[in-house]
């Protein structure tokens, strides 16, 4: 082994140890804080990625992460986007459980834990499949525990996906309707500028944002005007008592989210495998297969040839929402893309609008293209790069057989983490770490790249789970 190879191995081992330490410091026993200060509770899609990271260390602990989240599932099937930790002091996070007031307003909310009234992208089936992939390679006891967890998780996942396919897509378009930018996971992305601008904000009580206390520069976070709209939309949901049918009829923000919808397609592919492992009835497997087909048709309907990207649609107006963001690569996540469209997506990805931009510190995707007029390199989802989104794009490329391209993306992503630590997001040109530090999902995807499904030996022996 050469000196450079020994150095690289030592650096990777140190990075694995550091990432594992972040998860352990944020570990609350049955769930993991998204971050130690800015995000002290359990977030839904964070927990799915976190479980993928835990799987590299302890499949049983990974399973417990999701088990805790499933215990907060609503009667409707919805997995809430926040599960509140009762031990967190009041005022540490806003809006808190009292602001959401879910237990009083709807019988659908769980009685044993406090949650928010929104959801987030459904990465969870991918996490369960990954936990099983690790457990399958273990001893007999580990395999048995993994199989039992798959069977335990499957009904929760099926109810969750059915909720999204019905209550959130009553038209059967194959595209999920989100009712708040927070549901997208990409809170202040330019994708939402037009529909948010149409929201007329009524009277709001005074409030104090806890998030601004944990960042050095308020420009890294959503603006006061955006936050007013976020809270007004929550108030409108509360007036509707979180009733999905009522919200779908009249809510002032309803958007068909291509990225959320593409993740659901990928999750349904995973769910179909989990259904087989669980000996699920044939009618359930047929339903899941139908959701996959319908979801891919929905992606096709939102293709924008000129930009070479998929676009969201405003469900209230029927208009496409034109924005050059990383969400436009949604069809790659959904899979089943026709060859000409796949080539167009990869051309866009390699172009100066994204990975080919000469100013990028690392060739990882900016959340919003520098070519988009709304690009802001330090503002949350309006420009910074996010390691967790890089992981999703890497995963999609591997699924698509673009192994060499995926390997380059992984290498760039690990170089970024090596330099920036486990930051929430990163300024794409200077490489400055932004947002929260010791972010659990950044540590989790780093672990997966290094010792999980992203390790070169794993890629060489099949697709990552």
Where does each model-flagged region fall?
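Core register positions within helices of long alpha-helical scaffolds
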Residues: 53, 127-130, 134, 267, ...
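Extended glycan-interaction surfaces of carbohydrate-active proteins
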Residues: 2-42, 69-111, 174-258, 297-385, ...
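Hydrophobic/aromatic-rich effector regions of fungal transcription factors
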Residues: 105-137, 392-396
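Alpha-helical support elements that line or immediately flank enzyme active sites
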Residues: 47-77, 327-337, 390-403, 410
């Amino acid at each position: 082994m050469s000196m450079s190879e020994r150095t690289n191995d030592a650096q990777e081992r140190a990075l694995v140890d550091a990432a594992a330490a972040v998860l352990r410091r944020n570990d609350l026993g049955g769930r993991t804080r998204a971050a130690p200060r800015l995000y002290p509770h359990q977030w839904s899609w964070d927990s799915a990625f976190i479980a993928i990271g835990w799987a590299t260390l302890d499949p049983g602990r990974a399973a417990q992460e999701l088990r805790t989240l499933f215990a907060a599932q609503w009667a409707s099937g919805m997995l809430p986007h926040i599960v509140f930790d009762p031990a967190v002091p009041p005022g540490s996070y806003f809006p808190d459980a009292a602001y959401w007031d879910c237990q009083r307003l709807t019988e659908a909310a769980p009685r044993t834990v406090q949650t928010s009234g929104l959801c987030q992208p459904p990465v969870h089936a991918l996490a369960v499949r990954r936990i099983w992939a690790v457990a399958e390679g273990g001893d007999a006891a580990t395999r048995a525990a993994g199989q039992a967890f798959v069977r335990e998780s499957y009904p929760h996942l099926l109810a969750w996906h059915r909720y999204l396919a019905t209550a959130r897509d009553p038209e059967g378009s194959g595209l999920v309707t989100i009712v708040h930018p927070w549901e997208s996971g990409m809170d202040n992305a330019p994708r939402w500028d037009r529909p948010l601008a149409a929201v007329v904000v009524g009277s709001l009580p005074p409030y104090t944002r806890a998030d601004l206390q944990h960042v050095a520069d308020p420009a890294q976070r959503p603006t006061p005007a955006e936050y007013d709209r976020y809270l007004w939309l929550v108030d409108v949901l509360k007036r509707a008592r979180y009733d999905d049918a009522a919200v779908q009829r009249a809510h002032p923000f309803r958007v068909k989210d291509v990225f959320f919808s593409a993740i659901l397609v990928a999750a349904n592919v995973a769910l179909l495998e989990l259904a087989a492992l669980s000996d699920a009835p044939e009618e359930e497997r047929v339903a899941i297969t139908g959701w996959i087909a319908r979801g891919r048709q929905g992606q096709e309907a939102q293709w924008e040839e000129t930009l070479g990207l998929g676009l969201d649609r405003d469900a209230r107006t029927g208009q496409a929402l034109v924005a050059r963001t990383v969400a436009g690569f949604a069809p790659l996540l959904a899979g089943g893309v026709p060859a000409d469209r796949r080539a167009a997506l990869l051309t866009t990805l390699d172009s100066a609008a994204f990975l080919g931009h000469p100013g990028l510190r690392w060739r990882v995707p900016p959340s919003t293209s520098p070519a988009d007029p709304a690009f802001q390199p330090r503002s949350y989802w309006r420009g910074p790069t996010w390691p967790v989104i890089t992981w999703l794009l890497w995963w999609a490329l591997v699924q698509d057989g673009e192994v060499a391209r995926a390997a380059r993306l992984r290498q760039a992503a690990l170089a970024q983490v090596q330099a920036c630590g486990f930051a929430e997001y990163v300024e794409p040109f200077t490489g400055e770490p932004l947002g929260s530090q010791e972010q659990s999902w950044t540590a989790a995807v780093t672990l997966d790249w290094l010792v999980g499904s992203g390790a070169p030996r794993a890629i060489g022996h099949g697709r990552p789970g």
